[in-house]
Amino acid sequence: MGRTRLIKKLKSKGIVFLIAGIIISLISTLMLVAFIIDGLNSILIAFIIMLICGIIFIYNGVDYLKKENSKFIKKHPEILELADDLDINKVYEDNFIIISNKAISPKKDITKVAALDDVLGIYESIQRTNGIVTSHIIRLELRDGRCVTINVYAKKRETKDNLVLTISNYCHNAKVGYSNETLSYIKEQRKEYKEKRN
């Protein structure tokens, strides 16, 4: 079921975070000790920041390993139900996304599952470094403030357009395209959502 895949993915993310946190913490601690012994206090701040980052990674990794009791699941309890719906009521699937009657998720990361009604904006985002395209994603802006990204780098224009069209056909509350109108709509809907939750 989708719930088991979601929990498995959370567990693997937790392990990656935990290992990365331990490695970063160990490296920064060893370098911190070396710099203290040598008396170079000017770079001390950088290694303290690295140590803090390592501790944050460890904390998040341990939290993800709690599975259903993780803060991520407690903050978004509907995610387990939506993940199950993806397996039971699947209506569309391709190399990039899975869509059910109620939910949408990138195929590679079920932890980013979202309700179809919560998708407010759909647009492409291209990032360049020195004029070279380094990232090409389709962003789904959600009502709760999250953003689901689908990597479409090095895919044909037709594939990208078809993907956006398919998603927009299932997400009836969503505006398509990056514009001031779309951004203000997303901002307004998120504000209403926060007011209802409080």
Predicted regions and their residues:
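Canonical alpha-helical transmembrane segments of integral membrane proteins
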Residues: I15-F35, I45-I55
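Short amphipathic alpha-helical segments that mediate assembly, nucleic-acid/protein binding
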Residues: R3, I15, S42-I45, K160, ...
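Anionic N-terminal interaction surfaces
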Residues: G2-T4, L10, N41-N101
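Acidic, Ser/Thr- and proline-rich intrinsically disordered linker/docking segments
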Residues: Y123-N198
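Loop-to-transmembrane boundary segments
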Residues: L10-I19, K107
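Phosphoinositide-binding peripheral membrane targeting modules
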Residues: N95-T129, V133-S135
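Short, Lys/Arg-enriched, disordered terminal segments
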Residues: M1-G14, K191-N198
